[in-house]
Amino acid sequence: MGSLLRPVDLVNQPLGFQERYKILQKLFKQLQKAYAHTKGTNIDLERLATRLEVHVAKNSLSGQSYKFNMSILLRDVLKYKGDLSKIKINGRPLKGAKPHLSSIGNANSITTKSKAMEALKALILDSKVLEKNGYIVKEMQNKTNDDNSTQLYAPCLRCSSNFKKTDIMEKTLCRYHPLKRIYNRDTKNHQYPCCGETTDSVSFLRLGCKTFFHHVFRGESYDELCKISKFSSTDDIDGVENVLSLDCEMAFTSLGYEMIRLTIVDFFTGKTLFDHVIQPIGDIVDLNSDFSGVHEIDRTNCPTYKEALDVFLSENLINKNSILIGHGLENDLNVMRLFHNKVIDTAILYSRTKFKVSLKNLAFEVLSRKIQNGEHDSSQDAIATMDVVKVKIGISPSQNKWEK
């Protein structure tokens, strides 16, 4: 059995990892029996088993309901000979699995660039959806509000202490938890995965298991972001029609939150077209290396933001005809200071509730691929996001040759 077959980590776990793991193995074996007549590989079935199990886990309110729902699934997978459209969980048709079945025993239906472009354009998000999800859209230029950007004080993004922005380079003590707290259904409290402390703990560590000698902040409004550098519009750049997957790494500076690495990958060839560490405009406060993977920036050899902008905002890379793919792409476009309206965002495409699935979990759920096990890598993340979209429209992640 494949080493990739493990349950997807969830914010709210209906059951412990070991029990979910055992049930997932049983589901995989049932799928092997149900699809024995197809040409699907074990990897295909592992991916399907993972998707089905996490779907049930997310739609089960307790460990007991999870076990019951999984017993129904284990029974009906064989009963209906793998036809998932006939299976109901909690009285509802099993959603979320059927679109992925094309990879089992069938050839790719999309073999030309024109067909792929047609499918991709159908995934482009409406401007209202973009604005609702935190994207800075071009229309915001005409309704600016300087109230936030002129504030002298800001809450520290890590410890929530209010501090004076102009004092950001002065040393102080910031105590915080580097990882977001997770709700535990069994204990009914929140736990910090970085250290195991809980919100109802009386230990001093509940205040934070890590310290830093500066507070940090992150401006998010159009006005605040423009204090660092103005936005550019891709509408002003004509060029080739292309599809690009991108990801940025960011760091905290004296001006807020800035891009320090950018990777751009071509959708059709899988080739990396741009991958550079970039000098931020402000003075570096924290490179956030545990997450960004960037440990130093050579102020002599690394391109400045302006130099990088002149390269990636061009007729052969990002232009008005480009379709941009990313996960939580509003964060990337905001630090790149770009207005762009042809966007495919996997965080929005795969959101099932008000909470968005992480790229780490999405890559494992859809691709059975482990990413972000340590420091983040913008190249790895850009490729994973691109491959998730390929699977979404029925293309193999390894496909890089196309018929005319």
From Swiss-Prot:
InterPro entries cross-referenced by the UniProt entry: Exonuclease_RNaseT/DNA_pol3, REX1-like_exo, REXO1/3/4-like, RNaseH-like_sf, RNaseH_sf
Tree of life domain: Eukaryota
SUPFAM superfamilies: Ribonuclease H-like (SSF53098)
Enzyme category, top tier: hydrolase
Name of the featured protein: RNA exonuclease 3
EC number: 3.1.-.-
UniProt main location, coarse: cytoplasm
Signal peptide: none
Residue span, Exonuclease domain: 243-389
SMART domains, per database record: EXOIII
Cellular compartment(s): Cytoplasm; Nucleus
MF terms (GO), sorted A to Z: 3'-5' exonuclease activity; 3'-5'-RNA exonuclease activity; exonuclease activity; nucleic acid binding
Disulphide bridges: none
Native organism taxonomy: Eukaryota, Fungi, Dikarya, Ascomycota, Saccharomycotina
CC per GO annotation: cytoplasm; nucleus
Family listed: Belongs to the REXO1/REXO3 family.
Function: 3' to 5' exoribonuclease required for proper 3' end maturation of MRP RNA and of the U5L snRNA.
GO biological process: exonucleolytic trimming to generate mature 3'-end of 5.8S rRNA from tricistronic rRNA transcript (SSU-rRNA, 5.8S rRNA, LSU-rRNA); regulatory ncRNA 3'-end processing; rRNA 3'-end processing; U5 snRNA 3'-end processing
Keywords in alphabetical order: Cytoplasm, Exonuclease, Hydrolase, Nuclease, Nucleus, rRNA processing
Organism: Saccharomyces cerevisiae (strain ATCC 204508 / S288c)
